């Protein structure tokens, strides 16, 4: 059990979602952690996300540190008390404030608080979690996927994604990612982290 699950049973704080939510049902599965690794590789293939990660030198020093932070945030937001979830999101948002600049490879501008870049990171993790859940547990109905997406909109809001500009359904989010894939490529600095 996540530490916060124990707190929930002790003090009745279900956090933002609670044990009957799709967020709990999907994210409690250990195999969903593989979704985090898949998402990390998708993040690294995005030239501007990779540029921001290079600025913090996560890829050079410890390529999995970013994954651990991302999964920690996902766990806190999903299973934590409201205070834990909000505090975790605030810490990440503070960290993101200083990650910005010009990508020396593409000339593009990266900004860890940019809506499109935040949405790419969020969408990759959300879709990868569903992907591994369906590969290892069971297929989800369209309604379940849409409920998971709707619940994820709150987690997106916590990390300052403009939810008014977010795709409204699971399928719309999936289509948005597919459309963005045409812009994605592996750059030399991130090649060591791809399979």
Give a label for each model feature:
Residues 170-179:
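Small-residue-rich helix-loop
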Residues 26-64:
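Basic/polar, acidic-poor N-terminal "presequence/leader" segments
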Residues 149-155:
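Flexible glycine-rich active-site/ligand-binding loops centered on an Asp-His dyad
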Residues 75-78:
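Alpha-helical support elements that line or immediately flank enzyme active sites
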Residues 1-33:
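Extreme N-terminal leader/anchor segments
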Residues 184-195:
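Single conserved hydrophobic/aromatic residue that forms the stacking wall/gate
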Residues 60-66, 71, 82-128:
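A glycine-rich, hydrophobic loop/mini-helix early in the fold
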Residues 131-147, 159-163:
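Inter-helical turn/loop segments and adjacent helix faces that build the functional surface
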């Amino acid at each position: 059990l996540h530490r916060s699950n124990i707190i929930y049973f002790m003090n009745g704080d279900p956090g933002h979602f609670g044990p009957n939510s799709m967020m709990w049902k999907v994210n409690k599965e250990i195999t969903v952690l593989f979704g985090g690794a898949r998402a990390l590789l998708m993040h690294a293939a995005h030239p501007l996300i990779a540029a921001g990660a290079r600025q913090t030198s996560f890829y050079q020093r410890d390529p999995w540190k970013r994954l651990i932070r991302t999964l920690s945030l996902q766990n806190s937001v999903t299973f934590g008390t409201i205070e834990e979830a909000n505090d975790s999101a605030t810490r990440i948002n503070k960290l993101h404030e200083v990650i910005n600049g010009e990508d020396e490879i593409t000339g593009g501008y990266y900004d860890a608080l940019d809506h499109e870049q935040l949405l790419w990171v969020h969408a990759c993790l959300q879709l990868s979690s569903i992907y591994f859940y369906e590969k290892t547990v069971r297929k989800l109905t369209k309604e379940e996927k849409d409920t998971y997406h709707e619940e994820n909109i709150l987690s997106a809001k916590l990390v300052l994604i403009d939810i008014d500009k977010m795709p409204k359904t699971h399928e719309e989010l999936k289509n948005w990612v597919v459309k963005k894939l045409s812009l994605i490529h592996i750059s030399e600095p991130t090649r060591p982290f791809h399979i």
